[in-house]
Amino acid sequence: MQSNDVNAAAVNGKEAAYLGVPWEDAYGYAQAIKVGDTIHVAGQLSHDEKGNLIAPASLDESGKPAEFSMMEQQMRATYANAVKLLARFGATLDNVVEETLYVLDVDAAFAAAGKVRKESYGTARPQCASNLIGVTRLAFPEQLIEITFKAMLSGAEAKPR
């Protein structure tokens, strides 16, 4: 299902959205699924429409991130990808009720998150539950962050499109 646009397919009462990046077919999954009035967004990362990592971390000789200065840029691009997927279902970040940030460096993530989350959600106190979890590895060596989202539609938004 390769494409540069957010594609969608409906099967068994589930509506799926894709970004057209290579790993969707390689791994075999949808970027987001809408069931009823709930949208589940799979782990998003900082990539462009062709699947190239945005603001990749520099790596040390062992192939691990040498520093975490790109955390803010990666976080911002990750939220932008989530916005694209949510829009496919008529939702925005205002509909997000829970997010989980998986990060390689908790301190760098905390330093970036205060600013980026407030900008992304457009408020000083985003109205969603948020989890920040330190992990030892993500999908790509240069990747510093991955975020999953759960969003709820209500009223007119929940009607089939």
Segments predicted by a language model, with ranges:
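N-terminal presequence-like segments and the immediate start of the first folded domain
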Residues: 1-80, 84-97, 103-161
